[in-house]
Amino acid sequence: MLKTDLIFERENFSHHDFQNATFKNCHFYMCSFDHADLRDAKFIDCRFIESKALEGCSFRFANLKDASFTNCMLAMSLFNGANCMGLELRKCDLKGANFQGANFANRVSNTMFFCSAFITGCNLTYCNFERVLLEKCDLFENRWNGANLAGATLKGSDLSRCEFSPEQWGTFNVEQCDLTHVELDGLDIRRVSLFGVKICDWQQEQLLAPFGLIIL
């Protein structure tokens, strides 16, 4: 199913089956996709919020397994409780979106799980990722400034060329992450575990300057 150049306003798509559907250059304003089946669905150049609006679309408890959003406006969207395993978000504006309770993990047992997500080149400023598991995922070239990452674990993920706010360091797990080409201002190595983290040579100076050390 291919849909192009359509506008939907206040439509209730709850519990609808959009599996494998493709939407291109479509606009969705104040629409609900709660509990919808969006597995393997593709959204390209779509908008999910009107200009200057304060409320986006809702994907709460939707099945977004392996769904793909490319160059989409998803600001203020709600993804609470959604199945986001394998979700792909490329070059999207997600400012203020809420992912609290979203699931990016496949649990093999109570203690074993693996995550899958491809979130790259996105505006994630002021998003809510509180306590979200995003381990060993592609998360590079994103803007995370002001996002709520409290209790989240991004362990082992590629965070290269991302942007963070100084106050965010220490609120989430970055062990074994790729932090190359990331500004590390505000990161205190005394309280943030950098076990297995990758950085560039020039980043050493940022980490050690607060201690009065000069890197030659």
Swiss-Prot record:
Keyword vocabulary terms for this entry: Antibiotic resistance
Gene3D superfamilies: E3 ubiquitin-protein ligase SopA (2.160.20.80)
Keyword Metal-binding: no
InterPro entries: 5peptide_repeat, Pentapeptide-BTB/POZ_domain
One Pfam family in the UniProt entry: Pentapeptide
One GO BP: response to antibiotic
Family designation: Belongs to the pentapeptide repeat protein family.
NCBIfam families recorded: penta_rpt_Qnr (NF033086)
Role description: Has no effect when overexpressed in E.coli. When Cys-115 is mutated to Tyr and overexpressed it increases (fluoro)quinolone resistance in E.coli up to 16-fold for ciprofloxacin, levofloxacin and nalidixic acid.
Name listed for the protein in its UniProt record: Pentapeptide repeat protein VPA0095
